[in-house]
Regions:
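Auxiliary, metal-adjacent structural segments of Zn-dependent hydrolase domains
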Residues: 6-61
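Surface-exposed helix-capping loop/turn segments at secondary-structure junctions
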Residues: 2, 29-36, 94-97, 131-139
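Short active-site segment of divalent metal-dependent hydrolases/proteases
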Residues: 82-90
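Long, well-structured alpha-helical subdomains associated
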Residues: 124-152
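Short pre-active-site segment immediately N-terminal to the catalytic Zn-binding motif
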Residues: 64-81
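Post-HEXXH active-site segment of zinc metalloproteases
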Residues: 75-79, 91-122
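Short amphipathic alpha-helical segments
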Residues: 1, 61-65
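A structural signal for well-ordered alpha-helical scaffolds and beta->alpha junctions
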Residues: 13-24, 82, 113-117, 121
């Protein structure tokens, strides 16, 4: 896999970066995209002050995912990564060809883009949830083995 994660913020995101590195192959397999994306973590303090500010976006021209990280829980950031990777899959499948620039409210005014957003919300959340559950089950099994080893 040839994807990159670049932290352009001043935050220590090593734990988050590790989670994305674990999640990405799972997402690629389950979403089915055939080209790798680049993921950028960005800081925007003005945006973070806005309770309805941007959380992330996908750029189909350079196959990049940009995630705003200020003041956000890692799990929320992971959901954004998953959502934007669905858009990446849509782009790899040619579903974002010739859509033109998006504007505020595009998901409410353009029925096709509304469908793309619905797909990203649904699949993004489900793929992330499935990965999270699988990861948690593995951790529980590891803890059980460790407890049994301690008893012996």
């Amino acid at each position: 896999m040839n994807f990159n994660i670049k932290n352009n913020s001043s935050h220590d995101l090593s734990q988050l970066t590790n989670l994305v590195r674990e999640f990405y192959p799972y997402a690629k397999k389950h979403m089915g995209f055939n080209r790798d994306a680049n993921i950028f973590f960005e800081s925007d303090l003005q945006n973070a002050k806005n309770p309805l500010g941007k959380t992330a976006y996908y750029n189909p021209e350079d196959f990049s995912v940009t995630i705003y990280v200020d003041g956000r829980h890692p799990k929320d950031i992971m959901r954004s990564v998953s959502h934007e990777l669905v858009h990446h899959h849509q782009n790899c499948d040619g579903k974002l060809d010739n859509i033109g620039p998006t504007h505020e409210g595009y998901a409410q005014s353009d029925t096709y883009l509304r469908e793309m957003e619905e797909d990203a919300y649904k699949r993004g959340n489900l793929v992330f949830r499935d990965w999270e559950n699988q990861k948690n089950i593995k951790e529980i099994r590891k803890m059980k083995v460790t407890k049994e080893e301690l008893k012996n």
